[in-house]
Curated annotation (Swiss-Prot):
Stretches that traverse the bilayer: 104-140
Catalysis performed (reactions): a quinol + 2 Fe(III)-[cytochrome c](out) = a quinone + 2 Fe(II)-[cytochrome c](out) + 2 H(+)(out)
Species whose genome carries this gene: Bos taurus (Bovine)
Keyword Translocase: yes
EC number(s) recorded for this UniProt protein: 7.1.1.8
Protein name per UniProt: Cytochrome b-c1 complex subunit Rieske, mitochondrial
Keywords carried by this UniProt record: 2Fe-2S, Disulfide bond, Electron transport, Iron, Iron-sulfur, Membrane, Metal-binding, Mitochondrion, Mitochondrion inner membrane, Respiratory chain, Transit peptide, Translocase, Transmembrane, Transmembrane helix, Transport
Domain Rieske: 187-272
Gene3D superfamilies, per the entry: Cytochrome Bc1 Complex, Chain I, Rieske [2Fe-2S] iron-sulphur domain, Ubiquinol cytochrome reductase, transmembrane domain
Signal peptide, first to last residue: none
Swiss-Prot/TrEMBL cofactor(s): [2Fe-2S] cluster
Example of a GO MF term: oxidoreductase activity
Length: 274
């Protein structure tokens, strides 16, 4: 009843405290007597009464700003004038500084500049990655002094007459050719003055039946094909250089003969290259 009186505002002084008994299933042992009194309940007048008028006086009187979005619930906040709105003009391009001007007119130029920067960055990153990978791969390979000292032993009995066998030596293809009697006579009869890189067949071999060459074309470094070409020796498919059975250039753009490495015969059936 006191709470009702507190919420009654100006009618609180005329209200009095009352008690009402409700009959129950059990009879009470002692009948409670409530003496009647005409005194008004004592209220704390210093305490503010929570009513509509008092709460309205405490509420802010400034206008509200409501925000609504599809991804977040609606919210209401007070409008603050002391907040500094961030300015992103320093990060914008001159073409889009004016907010009232359409950016579609300068979109092509801006896209072109972005594509140019992206392409330049991609090329730079690819070049740097290529150098890093090349350095990493070269660090795992043998050093130059080890490669210079490396040698390879070749068993000549494994190469039949008229055939050419390829080996890997110091990272390059090595050709070992077992020439027939016909090939030996044919290459020995070639006129040296007709050759682009003049060199006699006997200057390129230690034993006439064995020709040992580095299988790298002297034009642009391609690997020639054995037993091919117009002269029955080697043919480079990259740019059409023709070599004879002695490895001498006879036709095509290659300027020099195939290189002859250093080698020695340790026996009739064994040769060491390097």
């Amino acid at each position: 009843m006191l709470s009702v009186a507190a919420r009654s505002g100006p009618f609180a002084p005329v209200l009095s405290a009352t008690s009402r008994g409700v009959a129950g299933a059990l009879r009470p042992l002692v009948q409670a007597a409530v003496p009647a009194t005409s005194e008004s309940p004592v209220l704390d007048l210093k305490r503010s009464v929570l009513c509509r008028e008092s709460l309205r006086g405490q509420a802010a009187g400034r206008p509200l700003v409501a925000s609504v979005s599809l991804n977040v619930p609606a919210s209401v906040r007070y409008s603050h004038t002391d907040i500094k709105v961030p300015d992103f003009s320093d990060y914008r391009r001159p073409e889009v500084l004016d907010s009232t001007k359409s950016s579609k007119e300068s979109s092509e130029a801006r896209k072109g500049f972005s594509y140019l920067v992206t392409a330049t960055t991609t090329v730079g990153v690819a070049y740097a990655a290529k150098n890093v990978v090349s350095q990493f791969v070269s660090s795992m390979s043998a050093s130059a002094d080890v490669l210079a000292m490396s040698k390879i032993e070749i068993k000549l009995s494994d190469i039949p007459e008229g055939k050419n066998m390829a080996f890997k030596w110091r990272g390059k293809p090595l050709f070992v050719r077992h020439r027939t009697k016909k090939e030996i006579d044919q290459e020995a009869a070639v006129e040296v003055s007709q050759l682009r890189d003049p060199q006699h067949d006997l200057e390129r071999v230690k034993k006439p039946e064995w020709v040992i060459l580095i299988g790298v074309c002297t034009h642009l470094g391609c690997v020639p094909i054995a037993n091919a070409g117009d002269f029955g020796g080697y043919y480079c498919p990259c740019h059409g250089s023709h070599y004879d059975a002695s490895g001498r250039i006879r036709k095509g753009p290659a300027p020099l003969n195939l290189e002859v490495p250093s080698y020695e015969f340790t026996s009739d059936d064994m040769v060491i290259v390097g």
